[in-house]
């Protein structure tokens, strides 16, 4: 996926810049989200990979499936189709979303937990993490039973590992060195 990230970055930045000019950042985020979801569906993915279907047909099908009304977003899909890059739409969406959060001075955080967290626990964690990372955070929670217990938090390239698995790994490293 690192290759997709590298390819998608200039597209996401260009689209975000245009969205800023047109004052359409949030509305285009929704359109990109729909496009990213549709492209990941099996039948649509196979259509995109089909060499006998020309680029304009692929773009038209995607535009119709999502129901895009915005001229610039339609043009964006047509450009991606013409360059055989429709498959990077999910990564373009992810990077555009990161740019939107950054623009709004919000960081994205993922809390990995061995067990489901209650809303109260997530709220308390959010308060602590906002202070620790000195930023407003948009938090999502994912369940990872292999953590055994505790949590692991990722904010950008920073990782805060308070899991049992992390502590056992640290102990193992200490004992073997």
UniProtKB/Swiss-Prot annotation:
Belongs to the ATPase delta chain family. This is ATP synthase subunit delta. Keywords: ATP synthesis, Cell inner membrane, Cell membrane, CF(1), Hydrogen ion transport, Ion transport, Membrane, Transport. NCBIfam families: ATP_synt_delta, PRK05758.2-2. It is found in: Cell inner membrane. InterPro entries: ATP_synth_OSCP/delta_N_sf, ATPase_OSCP/d_CS, ATPase_OSCP/dsu. It comes from Neisseria gonorrhoeae (strain ATCC 700825 / FA 1090). Pfam families: OSCP. F(1)F(0) ATP synthase produces ATP from ADP in the presence of a proton or sodium gradient. F-type ATPases consist of two structural domains, F(1) containing the extramembraneous catalytic core and F(0) containing the membrane proton channel, linked together by a central stalk and a peripheral stalk. During catalysis, ATP synthesis in the catalytic domain of F(1) is coupled via a rotary mechanism of the central stalk subunits to proton translocation. This protein is part of the stalk that links CF(0) to CF(1). It either transmits conformational changes from CF(0) to CF(1) or is implicated in proton conduction. HAMAP family: ATP_synth_delta_bact. One of its GO terms (cellular component) is plasma membrane. It is a peripheral membrane protein. F-type ATPases have 2 components, F(1) - the catalytic core - and F(0) - the membrane proton channel. F(1) has five subunits: alpha(3), beta(3), gamma(1), delta(1), epsilon(1). F(0) has three main subunits: a(1), b(2) and c(10-14). The alpha and beta chains form an alternating ring which encloses part of the gamma chain. F(1) is attached to F(0) by a central stalk formed by the gamma and epsilon chains, while a peripheral stalk is formed by the delta and b chains. One of its GO terms (molecular function) is proton-transporting ATP synthase activity, rotational mechanism. It comes from the Bacteria.
């Amino acid at each position: 996926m690192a290759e997709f990230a590298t390819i998608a970055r200039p597209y996401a930045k260009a689209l975000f810049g245009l969205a800023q000019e047109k004052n359409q950042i949030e509305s285009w985020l929704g359109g990109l989200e729909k496009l990213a979801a549709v492209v990941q569906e099996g039948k649509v993915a196979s259509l995109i990979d089909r060499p006998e279907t020309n680029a304009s047909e692929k773009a038209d099908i995607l535009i119709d499936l999502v129901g895009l009304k915005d001229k610039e977003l339609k043009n964006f899909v047509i450009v991606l189709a013409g360059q055989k890059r429709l498959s990077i739409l999910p990564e373009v969406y992810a990077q555009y979303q990161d740019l939107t959060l950054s623009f709004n001075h919000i960081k994205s955080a993922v809390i990995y937990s061995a067990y489901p967290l209650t809303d109260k626990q997530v709220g308390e964690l959010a308060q602590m993490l906002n202070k620790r990372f000195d930023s407003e955070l948009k938090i999502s929670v994912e369940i990872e039973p292999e953590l055994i217990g505790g949590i692991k938090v990722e904010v950008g390239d920073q990782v805060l590992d308070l899991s049992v698995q992390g502590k056992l790994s640290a102990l193992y490293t200490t004992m073997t060195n």
